Amino acid sequence: LFSFKELNEQFKRKIKVVLPVDLVLIIAASFACYCTNMENTYGLEVVGHIPRGIPPPRAPPMNILSAVITEAFGVALVGYAASLALAQGSAKKFKYSVDDNQEFLAHGLSNVISSFLFCIPSAAAMGR
């Protein structure tokens, strides 16, 4: 992976389209697994059939709530704090105001609604 990324950097001027190396490696590894029957030969676990489309919305399983409540609270708190810090930083840089309550409501609703589609929690990401 590293050597391919270095090659992309060297040939960036000559080739206008950057090769998506990560995607190429995933496809090559999947093809190699399929062709060499690595599931049976080496005991590797293969995902199998992946259904198409978006799964229908359904309620998250409430029977595991007691097991994950503390971790979920921590993820929610850190995600909200990071998102709010970045929003306030952008507001200061571009001279606009941020309402903490509106951010809290938007962040909470987006994560609650996305839980019915079994999405991962959303939060802002701090760049370099």
Curated annotation (Swiss-Prot):
Parts of the chain that traverse the membrane: 15-35, 67-87, 104-124
Membrane topology note: Multi-pass membrane protein
Expression by tissue: Expressed in gastric epithelium, predominantly in the gastric parietal cells but also at lower levels in mucosal cells.
InterPro entries from the UniProt entry: SLC26A/SulP_dom, SLC26A/SulP_fam
Localization annotation: Basolateral cell membrane; Recycling endosome membrane; Apical cell membrane; Lateral cell membrane
Membrane-side (Cytoplasmic) residue stretches: 36-66, 125-128
Residues on Extracellular side: 1-14, 88-103
PANTHER family referenced in this protein's UniProt entry, alphabetically: SULFATE TRANSPORTER (PTHR11814)
Function recorded in the entry: Acts as an anion channel mediating the transport of chloride, bromide, iodide, nitrate, sulfate, gluconate, thiocyanate, oxalate and bicarbonate ions. Its permeability towards bicarbonate is weak and increases when pH is above 7. Mediates thiocyanate transport in retinal pigment epithelium cells. Mediates iodide transport in the thyroid gland, playing an important role in the synthesis of thyroid hormones and the maintenance of thyroid function.
Protein name: Anion exchange transporter
Organism whose genome encodes this protein: Oryctolagus cuniculus
